[in-house]
Amino acid sequence: MEIRYIDQSDDLIEISNIYESSWKYAYKGIIPQDYLDSIPTGRWASGIDKFRMNNLVMIENGHIIGTASISKSRWQQYSDYGEIISIYFLPAYMGKGYGKHLLKKCIEELNIRGYDKILLWVLEDNQRARAFYEKNGFSCSKNYMNSNIGGKELREVMYFIE
């Protein structure tokens, strides 16, 4: 198993496919199905390319199986925090212990950048993700934000570790 930053040799469509597959699997029953079904191939590729320095990949047996995005907090009131923007895996690799390794690497990389406090946002109804972050030391805050995804109003909750 290897975790590293994305480089020029990586196939951005392959990495985008991890986002797409993960969304369709993890958000089933949370985000409207017609929206999930309409996600086009490569939807995330341009964003991944734009922010290459902030994207990690996890490789197992020569294949990219997971990806994560990190940065300084995007929220002014948390300007001294690092942020884990996303962690996604191909569905076949979910629930097998890979996530804790990628999460640990995200935390390490943000610590190297000088962030001892880290936040992330999770869909309130995504119980699997919430349990994962809580098991790995993150605390649920009382901070929420509303999002509209696929025409459905959803609420995200902020988690943090200090």
Q: What do the PLM-derived regions correspond to, one by one?
A:
Residues 1-3:
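Extreme N-terminal starter segment of soluble prokaryotic enzymes
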Residues 5-9, 16, 20-92, 103-105, ...:
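Acetyl-CoA-dependent GNAT
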Residues 10-11, 97:
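Short helix-adjacent coil turns
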Residues 66, 82, 95-99, 137, ...:
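Glycine-centered flexibility sites
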Residues 82, 116-119, 123-130, 134-136, ...:
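C-terminal "cap" of GNAT-fold acetyltransferases
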Residues 86-104, 111-113, 124-131, 135-136:
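Conserved glycine-rich acetyl-CoA-binding loop
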